[in-house]
Amino acid sequence: MKILLTAINAKYIHSNLAVYSLKASSGRYRDDVEIAEYTINNYIDEILSSIYIKKPDLIAFSCYIWNIDMVLELIDLFHKVAGDVPVWVGGPEVSYDARAVLEKNPGITGVMCGEGEATFRELLACYEETFGGDLRAGNVMDFWKRLEQVQGLVFRSWDQTIVATGERPPLAMDDLPFPYEDLKAFDHKIIYYETSRGCPFSCSY
């Protein structure tokens, strides 16, 4: 199974911590996960072509205020050329009202809400354990039942109903692996690293 984590950054010098952290935490699926980073200055057809050539079995987008319009347009175009490839999204721009995002965007399979490292790994396990390497084979109903057990998801089920699996408890930061494999690959770029998450005053983010 080939999984593509996609980030559209504001500038070329930026990197997306979220996708690197998801890959680092993906466990036995790590070698199946590829990261693709673009910028909002890339032509949308250029990004679409690059993604299509990679032939992902599953694609996930990291969504922020600066890229959400571009991401949603890309998802619509991607389905026109690639068919029914599962598309998942995450990030602050979609997780605060995931149900509304799914209602407005039929091309999105589901939203990963909150801290995504464990959620993403368990999501991949649902796909791999149900379908193996071929997402066109396997017991579809069994897949949806498995998915309902993964905390931190809001998704469109087989009958088009929207299912929310509930919040995942905060992760212990000390348990998360270092997200960057090769720091030399980030020469002349800005990288980000978290030492804490959330707000001590219980702000919504």
Where are these regions (language model features)?
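A short, charged/proline- and glycine-enriched loop
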Residues: 1-2, 188
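Glycine-rich beta-alpha loop elements in corrinoid/cobalamin-binding modules
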Residues: 2, 18, 25, 32-169
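Nucleotide-activated donor-dependent transferases that construct or modify glycoconjugates
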Residues: 2-11
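Short hydrophobic "strand-cap" motifs at the C-terminus of beta-strands
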Residues: 6, 89-92, 195-196
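Tryptophan-centric aromatic hotspots in well-structured domains and transmembrane helices
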Residues: 12, 66, 96, 101, ...
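Short N-terminal binding/cap micro-motifs at the start of the first secondary-structure element
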Residues: 12-18
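A short local loop/turn or secondary-structure capping micro-motif enriched for an aromatic residue
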Residues: 13, 170-175
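Radical SAM [4Fe-4S] cluster-binding motif and immediate context
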Residues: 174-205
